[in-house]
């Protein structure tokens, strides 16, 4: 059995580690609430914009319209946009996205497509650049709660690559935030856009309402498309191309912002859970070490008593 000093040092080290993990858990818990609220607040706008595009499609002949973001062409090159975090200590959050990106990369290259990567977050950047993957662009240092400016910077780069025919399809790989204890990596086609299939059937519908005199966001019930239909007698001054060129870039930027926000919320929730588990494990380990310390101390005392008794008997 280890000596008493070694056990005392280990107990002290474990308790100090627990203080750190507990502090990180509290920080993550405070930040995740803000990130969660940001995710919920952004959803009504995204939902409403998707419904507007759906209804416009039903009123106007978008299939005859021409927009760079809707251009369907033979797919030869595909860009994967992978969203991870800048830091670790968040359970399997980063590893799950990296694994899903590798799987998708292997699937596409196995079918003969040329694949390029756009990496968001230091974890993805560090992993893929060290393994000689074809990296098109990298972005890091995003805010804990991503902003529209950050999403616009990334979407502008991706959009320019698509319009310039540098890529034929763009897929987004990010972590969908479900709740504080559940999230999942998903793959979503970002470009080309299709107004006939603009809404994700798995998306919840969120509405901005008032409760007790305050604005709040609540999940909506009922059919997916709850947007009032556009009356058939309305005449639009703009052509379908003008409407699409105004709305689709906004929709693209919003989709990217939403994915960044959901990923950030998922990262913080994963970190909170990981630090909570680490704190619990440290507490249990400290208990076990304390028990070992007491046993070792008791054995040492017993040994000393036996030695004293043996010496007294020898003298007597």
Swiss-Prot record:
Source organism of this protein record: Parasynechococcus marenigrum (strain WH8102)
SUPFAM superfamilies, sorted: ATP synthase (F1-ATPase), gamma subunit (SSF52943)
Subcellular location: Cellular thylakoid membrane
Molecular function per GO: ATP binding; proton-transporting ATP synthase activity, rotational mechanism
Gene that encodes the chain: atpG
GO cellular component: plasma membrane-derived thylakoid membrane; proton-transporting ATP synthase complex
UniProt name for this protein: ATP synthase gamma chain
Membrane topology: Peripheral membrane protein
Keywords associated with the record: ATP synthesis, CF(1), Hydrogen ion transport, Ion transport, Membrane, Thylakoid, Transport
Main localisation: membrane
Family from the record: Belongs to the ATPase gamma chain family.
